[in-house]
Amino acid sequence: MLAVALAIFAGATARLFVWPGSGAPSRVDAVLMMAGPDAPLSTAVRLARMHKARFLLISRGHEGYGGPCPQPVPRVRLICFEPDPATTQGEAEYAGRLARKYHWRSIMLVTITPQEWRARQRMGRCFRGSVYGAAGGIPWYSWPYQIAYEWGATVKMLVVQREC
């Protein structure tokens, strides 16, 4: 019985946090970089330079935790912000407000691999359009901490914070 429970836990961990998988279209209305350790700013800027979206949103997290606002990209509207609250929930709420204001139909979230599934779920609660993910890697030594963190944050999202 314990072996079955461990196998289910390992399978869920792999599916949700290691290989979350969410194909992306060639263009979306906005790209949102989520703040955090190892924030994949270079991935978000690369997508903007490839003109994958008309808007590039950079979450600076709490006290600029997401890093500095990058240089503007021609023909892409750059919006750097500090979410309130300074969490994935706050990022989703802010992006959801902008989506309603600008009538977006799709958004791509740029985050670290372990956070991608949860970030898409949160964004889906605040935005009625299509939500895609583009994940950046993390150092191998970060995986144990990130998986433990994501399990806790996922339970919180599913049990405590059930709405946008």
Q: Could you tell me what each predicted segment is?
A:
Residues 143-163:
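A transmembrane-helix-recognition feature enriched in membrane-embedded lipid enzymes
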